């Protein structure tokens, strides 16, 4: 259902969408501008399309979800992306998070273990002319060593601990944002900064994400 079909003006819909995101703590002007430019509706298919502008997670293919917009904004904000940064996203999903990051970074690499998700996200990237995103089928728990090191890494699935291969692929001074914890319990969103010697860990907020699974999916 489009905004015109349900009687809502597109400009009003966008204002309502951004207000919901801001009210939940997303205050970074660049992140808000990126979320204003990227239409979440382009990444939501089927019967849930008319709920694309609500601040809620929604089911997508392969048993995955598209994160609620406020969480996308908060994770992007915590990542503190600079315009010249090279970013790795682990867990392409619908492609919405990578699209938002593409407005903040020089280059975005996004990987997913599900072929269908990579294919469908790539189609949307092409349709929206997002030319600085490369989507690949890969086991994200091992990162993307051929493109490392990265200025920023964003993980959109929960690990029991920050994955060692991903930590190793961060530049000195680089930042990784990752949900950590058991999948059957509330997890913590962690911000990891790589130092000259070791890493600094900061807990940000409770979250709930699907688990980070090793291997390549069959779909």
Swiss-Prot record:
InterPro entries documented for this protein: PCMT, SAM-dependent_MTases_sf
Cellular localization per UniProt: Cytoplasm
Pfam short name (any one): PCMT
Gene Ontology cellular component annotations, sorted alphabetically: cytoplasm
Molecular function GO terms recorded: protein-L-isoaspartate (D-aspartate) O-methyltransferase activity
EC number: 2.1.1.77
Chief localisation class: cytoplasm
Homology family: Belongs to the methyltransferase superfamily. L-isoaspartyl/D-aspartyl protein methyltransferase family.
Function field: Catalyzes the methyl esterification of L-isoaspartyl residues in peptides and proteins that result from spontaneous decomposition of normal L-aspartyl and L-asparaginyl residues. It plays a role in the repair and/or degradation of damaged proteins.
Name of this chain's protein: Protein-L-isoaspartate O-methyltransferase
Organism of provenance: Cereibacter sphaeroides (strain ATCC 17023 / DSM 158 / JCM 6121 / CCUG 31486 / LMG 2827 / NBRC 12203 / NCIMB 8253 / ATH 2.4.1.) (Rhodobacter sphaeroides)
């Amino acid at each position: 259902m489009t905004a015109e079909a349900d009687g809502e003006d597109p400009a009003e819909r966008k204002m309502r969408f951004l207000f919901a995101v801001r009210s939940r703590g997303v205050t970074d002007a660049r992140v808000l501008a990126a979320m204003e430019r990227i239409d979440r509706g382009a990444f939501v298919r089927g019967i849930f399309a008319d709920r694309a502008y609500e601040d809620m997670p929604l089911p997508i293919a392969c048993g995955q979800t598209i994160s609620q917009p406020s969480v996308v904004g908060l994770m992007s904000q915590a990542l503190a992306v600079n315009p010249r940064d090279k970013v790795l996203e682990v867990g392409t999903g619908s492609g919405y998070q990578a699209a938002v990051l593409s407005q903040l970074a020089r280059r975005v690499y996004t990987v997913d273990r599900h072929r269908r998700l990579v294919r469908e996200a790539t189609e949307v990237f092409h349709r929206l002319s997002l030319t600085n995103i490369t989507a690949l089928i890969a086991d994200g728990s091992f990162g993307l060593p051929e493109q490392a090191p990265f200025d920023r890494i964003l993980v959109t699935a929960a690990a029991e601990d920050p994955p060692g291969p991903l930590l190793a692929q961060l530049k000195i001074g680089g930042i990784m944002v990752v949900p950590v914890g058991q999948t059957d319990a509330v997890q913590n969103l962690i911000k990891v900064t790589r130092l000259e010697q070791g890493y600094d860990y900061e807990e940000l907020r409770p979250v709930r994400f699907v688990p980070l699974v090793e291997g390549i999916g069959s779909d």
